[in-house]
Amino acid sequence: MEGLRIAGDTTSTVCVDGEGRAVSFIHSLAFTFGARLTVPGTGVLLNNRLGRGAYLIGGHPNEVKPRRKPLHTLNAWVYDSDTLGLLHVGSCPGGDGQVQWNMQVLSHLVDHGATPQEAVAMPRLTVSPGSDSNVLGHRQELRCEPGLDSATLSRLREWGHNVVEVPDQVGGPGGSAMAISLDHANGTLAAGADPRMEGIALAL
């Protein structure tokens, strides 16, 4: 198993069938081994998602209370059109970066006409720190992957962002995106898997 990444606790799958039905699924244990409890007789490990970002501090925006849905990072999406139906489906594990990265991938697909593989491989930006208690209060950064042009980085700095250039995409802070697009003109599907982590795009 040399070379395989063993860090991480979130998995995601996106799929589209021949009739255009789509699923975007994401599951996470939250911390390593989740709640460290299994459902008896099943081997299913329970997550500790509530314990990762919800607080017992009165008045905290993510305070645990009855009838509340605490903020969490899981984010899967399907993008469709009122006239055409399904256009794109995707997901991107990676903690607090998920919403940020999914929006960037979706923008590449919708606003810039990228293919799914192009969209998931493009450099990404990440606002940091996230919401985990161990990073709250850390200095604000805008982490930028390699490949963003110097003019863009300069403009971000002019706008007041504390730009931090990360050295590498692979295994870096950009998550592990995947996407599938449906071309209604010719009835074909195209898929992309992020080069940052292990993943694969398959036609079955």
For the regions a protein language model found, what residue spans apply to each?
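In a subset of proteins, long, contiguous C-terminal domains/tails are tracked
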Residues: 151-204
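Proteins synthesized as precursors that undergo proteolytic processing into mature forms
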Residues: 3-167, 174
